[in-house]
Amino acid sequence: MMPLAVLHVKRLQPELITPAKPTPQETKFLSDIDDQEFLRFQVPIIMCYKDNPSLNKNRNPVKVIREALSRALVYYYPLAGRLREGPNRKLVVDCNGEGILFIEASADVTLEQLGDKILPPCPLLEEFLFNFPGSDGIIGCPLVLVQVTCLTCGGFILALRLNHTMCDAAGLLLFLTAIAEMARGAHAPSILPVWERELLFARDPPRITCAHHEYEDVIGHSDGSYASSNQSNMVQRSFYFGAKEMRVLRKQIPPHLISTCSTFDLITACLWKCRTLALNINPKEAVRVSCIVNARGKHNNVRLPLGYYGNAFAFPAAISKAEPLCKNPLGYALELVKKAKATMNEEYLRSVADLLVLRGRPQYSSTGSYLIVSDNTRAGFGDVNFGWGQPVFAGPVKALDLISFYVQHKNNAEDGILVPMCLPSSAMERFQQELERITQEPKEDICNNLRSTRIMSMM
């Protein structure tokens, strides 16, 4: 593994990439789901590609992606605009064609030398996604920033930062897929983008028909809790869940839950319990975990066009007092997670939009201990092919305050899930200890399997 001190990244001056053809000059409204306070932030992802001469015929990835971006923006022209605030801070998109920010860069390093430093929490993120001064605001700033960094091995890293009010993971994938198709020679995206944000406007009149714990202040909040503490000492680490960890966790689940329990559900229950223990929360205090649930697809019965690229999700919250969460077996937390996810349907999403309008776009609740988790293992970023084949890694690269993203990762040829966590430094040590304890195989199983066990932590 190379020492970080020897990495040198050379960047050219940022440039604005505009649509390749004239596009409509107009104002577009965001949906009431897009417009919530929770989404007014920038989300970074990273995609790492090996050299592949048999496929790319020595093409320059910077040139290919720059041109493909410009062509894709003809179809996704709102992303080349700027956000403005209207009355009551309502966001609108000024489709002025100013463009997205693009940075060409090169680094004197190979993918092999970078090793796991491209994985969450990615200590090199600022090198591969330069925060150009003045570009990271929500209002009046570029909605997308892309940096393409060529490596000495012939591979490259594409890092992207997106204003989350414009797209969710599924919407971003549509945009990236369109760019990739253009890079491989397509004349138009295979799935044409659909704006139609009015599909997720609040109803008239708005009416809250579901319980939304994610937006509610809870009783029993302690001023000494994590949410109200000084977060200047926050640290990030990533934790790996492979076959061994999942096997141990499943052994702790009651029979009636095993057949309906997903890997995501089980990891979420485990993290929620371990995090609550690590934060040493008042036993009477309410603690929550929210699962980001995509509204698309038949399962949730939300009727949206295939090319809809706006935010179409909710994050229903499971809630419990800290004491029963910590003292009960893992099945207690798991059942609460499953019940919260099951509340998500079209009515729930409509009720969220109505709540946001009626209550003036409240932030998610800031009282008590709160964790938000997002499953990106099936997001599809690993299938985006610009002409160099599939990426060796693709997805979110760090936890964002209370939000943790689950990403696919292969560890020693074993497929697993990597989860970055953000906690105060003292709590992080306790969290790792709790996680190791709950995923530790019994001694008799270790002897039977003739293998050692561990939970991987990456600083």
From Swiss-Prot:
The active site is at H164 (proton acceptor), N385 (proton acceptor). Keywords: Transferase. Its EC number is 2.3.1.-. The keyword Cytoplasm does not apply. It comes from the Eukaryota. Pfam families: Transferase. GO terms for biological process: alcohol metabolic process; fruit ripening, climacteric. Belongs to the plant acyltransferase family. PANTHER family: ACYL TRANSFERASE 4 (PTHR31147), OS05G0315700 PROTEIN (PTHR31147:SF66). Involved in the biosynthesis of volatile esters which confer ripe apple fruit flavor. Alcohol acyl transferase that can use a wide range of alcohols as substrate, including 2-methylbutanol, hexanol and ethanol, to produce esters such as butyl butanoate, butyl hexanoate, hexyl butanoate, ethyl butanoate and ethyl hexanoate and, to some extent, 2-methylbutyl acetate (2MBA), butyl acetate, hexyl acetate and 2-methylbutyl butanoate (2MBB). This is Alcohol acyl transferase 1 allele GSa. The lineage of its organism: Eukaryota, Viridiplantae, Streptophyta, Embryophyta, Tracheophyta.
